[in-house]
Amino acid sequence: MTTNTHTLQIEEILELLPHRFPFLLVDRVLDFEEGRFLRAVKNVSVNEPFFQGHFPGKPIFPGVLILEAMAQATGILAFKSVGKLEPGELYYFAGIDEARFKRPVVPGDQMIMEVTFEKTRRGLTRFKGVALVDGKVVCEATMMCARSREA
């Protein structure tokens, strides 16, 4: 456990990510170290709009949105590690490998996303990500993002 903890509240997250409700999936950053790792939280509420159809009577947080939450966490880590983008630049979600879903996420859960920087090569940055609920893995994946000018 580090003694020099860095946290980010929602106001700071909104300065870094372009996402907004209902697609902002990071509520708070619990800890990070630039260029190394980030731990963030998503509080899963029954009021999420997608629960109306996924699934009526048995609400389950969509797996693709777990991946998106981890991708947003990697975006925050990238911004905090290499700085804000220049005008006309974006971080694009460029790929995902080895995604595995271990158990469902349901309303009332607090999902912790842990992402770690792996490497940058040819303009692509690779991260490992894991999402946990109550200390148990619900999803894991390798994700890539690319910094690029808007098309």
From Swiss-Prot:
What superkingdom heads the lineage?
Bacteria
Q: How is it modified after translation?
A: The N-terminus is blocked.
GO CC terms for this protein? cytoplasm; membrane
Q: Name one Pfam family in it.
A: FabA
Give the catalytic activity: a (3R)-hydroxyacyl-[ACP] = a (2E)-enoyl-[ACP] + H2O; (3R)-hydroxybutanoyl-[ACP] = (2E)-butenoyl-[ACP] + H2O; (3R)-hydroxyhexanoyl-[ACP] = (2E)-hexenoyl-[ACP] + H2O; (3R)-hydroxyoctanoyl-[ACP] = (2E)-octenoyl-[ACP] + H2O
Could you tell me one molecular function GO term of this UniProt entry?
Answer: (3R)-hydroxyacyl-[acyl-carrier-protein] dehydratase activity
One of the protein's GO biological processes? fatty acid biosynthetic process
Q: Which Gene3D superfamilies match?
A: Hotdog Thioesterase (3.10.129.10)
Active-site residues, Swiss-Prot/TrEMBL: H54
Q: What is its EC number?
A: 4.2.1.59
Q: Which UniProt keywords apply?
A: Cytoplasm, Lipid A biosynthesis, Lipid biosynthesis, Lipid metabolism, Lyase
* UniProt-annotated location(s): Cytoplasm
Q: What is its main location?
A: cytoplasm
Stretches assigned to coiled coil: none
Q: Does the keyword Phosphoprotein apply?
A: no
Q: Which PANTHER family match?
A: 3-HYDROXYACYL-[ACYL-CARRIER-PROTEIN] DEHYDRATASE
Its family? Belongs to the thioester dehydratase family. FabZ subfamily.
Q: What does this protein do?
A: Involved in unsaturated fatty acids biosynthesis. Catalyzes the dehydration of short chain beta-hydroxyacyl-ACPs and long chain saturated and unsaturated beta-hydroxyacyl-ACPs.
Subunit text: Oligomer.
Query: What name does UniProt use for this protein?
Result: 3-hydroxyacyl-[acyl-carrier-protein] dehydratase FabZ
